[in-house]
Swiss-Prot record:
Recorded metabolic or biological pathway in which this protein acts: Glycolipid biosynthesis; lipid IV(A) biosynthesis; lipid IV(A) from (3R)-3-hydroxytetradecanoyl-[acyl-carrier-protein] and UDP-N-acetyl-alpha-D-glucosamine: step 6/6
Taxonomic lineage: Bacteria, Pseudomonadati, Bacteroidota, Bacteroidia, Bacteroidales
Stated name of the protein: Tetraacyldisaccharide 4'-kinase
Matches recorded under InterPro entries: LpxK, P-loop_NTPase
TM region(s), chain numbering: none
Organism: Bacteroides fragilis (strain ATCC 25285 / DSM 2151 / CCUG 4856 / JCM 11019 / LMG 10263 / NCTC 9343 / Onslow / VPI 2553 / EN-2)
Pfam family, one: LpxK
Record's keyword terms, sorted: ATP-binding, Kinase, Lipid A biosynthesis, Lipid biosynthesis, Lipid metabolism, Nucleotide-binding, Transferase
GO cellular component: plasma membrane
Record GO terms (molecular function): ATP binding; tetraacyldisaccharide 4'-kinase activity
GO biological process: lipid A biosynthetic process; lipopolysaccharide core region biosynthetic process
Protein role: Transfers the gamma-phosphate of ATP to the 4'-position of a tetraacyldisaccharide 1-phosphate intermediate (termed DS-1-P) to form tetraacyldisaccharide 1,4'-bis-phosphate (lipid IVA).
Length: 376
């Protein structure tokens, strides 16, 4: 296993101890029943982590949607981080990243046949989703809600980054943990994400021992598989889609990211070209007119004829909102999609674990198979 350098600010340990005491007390109040977790009569799957930063929650949520939506009526509920609205909003054709948040909008854009909603109050959001009819919601995916213990999810999936395992980290602000590592015990499934494709068998064993999970917990490993570059503004682009392998070594790329950790996408692009100019913003960054001007300036410095703007799907949702974006840039902007791959030949086991939970925890104990369901 490759050595990962995790930056710990030791001088902030006293603040971390105070923070940890507060979080531990809150968790104990839930464990003792002093703070109430609410159960709902519908299968609820929570996807989250115990660290700040990107662990791949949205790609894993999309994996679950693909797995479930042919057989069940799926709804996704998020708080809609950095949206410009408040309260419960059910996504419609008029929704955008500003009204529901970049990640919910990305999901709705890719899966128009499911319900996507946002609400800071997850209990209220679930109650609203359960009032929907024609057809009723059959399973709810909670995005980034591992610490939201007011909802008692039936299945908790905890993600941890291969390059920053929670067992190597410490509490904020000295580290990046939202809660003590013991919080992992609430998860029924733990996934080590962003694994290198060539991860060695011995690394699986080392990580398994270090995470020290209980027998009731299932451990899986996943990696990212990148798709073809897709035009963000297809009406303006001469080429709608490009394979990564079509990139030439002399091609110059302006890479725009507003995600927590752009390292994986950089490594993927560097396989094809080393001419990468990175313009990195903070996670969920709302692009300003000044940012758009900077993008135009940086792109203008690249050699004409062999240049491209690449961004993530999440960042693309925020760029699309901007009427101020220079029209001359639009034909050159492409998004790089990400798909999740379950490693160790464990994909079938993982899929059956998820589907089995949903089938066993429906309102009637079982659901009739939908006529449009794909046979597996």
């Amino acid at each position: 296993m490759e050595e990962n350098s995790i930056k710990i600010h030791k001088w902030l340990y006293p603040a971390s101890w105070l923070y940890g005491a507060g979080v531990a007390l809150r968790n104990k109040l839930f464990d003792w029943g002093k703070l109430q977790s609410k159960s709902f009569n519908v299968p609820i799957i929570c996807i989250g982590n115990i660290a700040v930063g990107g662990t791949g929650k949205t790609p894993h949520t999309e994996y679950l949607i693909k797995l479930l939506h042919d057989e069940f009526q799926v709804a996704v509920l998020s708080r809609g981080y950095k949206r410009h609205t408040k309260g419960f909003i059910l996504s419609t054709a008029e929704s955008d990243a500003r009204s529901i948040g970049d990640e919910p909008y990305q999901i709705q854009s890719k899966f128009s046949d499911i319900r996507v909603a946002v609400d800071e109050d997850r209990c209220h959001g679930i109650e609203r989703l359960l009032t929907l009819k024609e057809p009723p919601v059959e399973v709810i995916l909670l995005d980034d809600a591992f610490q939201h213990r007011y909802v008692k999810a039936g299945l908790n999936i905890l993600l941890t980054d291969y390059h920053r395992l929670f067992c190597d980290d410490t509490l904020m602000p000295a580290g990046r943990l939202r809660e003590p590592a013991q919080g992992k015990n609430r998860a029924q499934i733990v996934i080590v994400t962003k694994c290198p494709p060539d991860i060695k068998p011995i690394d699986y064993n080392i990580i398994t021992k270090r995470l020290n999970l209980f027998p009731y917990q299932q451990l899986y490993f996943s990696s990212f598989r990148y798709g073809n570059l897709r035009a963000v503004f297809p009406d303006c682009a001469t080429v709608q889609e490009r394979k990564l392998s079509s990139l030439q070594t002399e091609e110059q790329i302006l890479l725009i990211t507003g995600i927590a950790s752009p390292d994986t996408i950089i490594r993927e692009l560097e396989i094809h070209t080393r001419n990468i100019d990175l313009l990195a913003f903070s996670d969920h960054h709302n692009f300003s007119q000044r940012d758009l001007a900077q993008i135009k300036e940086r792109f203008g410095k690249l050699r004409k004829g062999q240049r491209l703007i690449v961004t993530t799907e999440k960042d693309a949702t925020r760029l699309i909102c901007h009427q101020e974006l220079d029209e001359g840039l639009k034909p050159f902007i492409y998004a790089l999609p990400i798909e999740v791959e379950i490693l160790q030949n464990q994909q079938d086991n993982f899929n059956q674990h998820i589907i089995g939970y949903v089938r066993e925890n429906t309102r009637n104990g079982s659901l009739p198979e939908r006529k449009d369901a794909h046979k597996s």
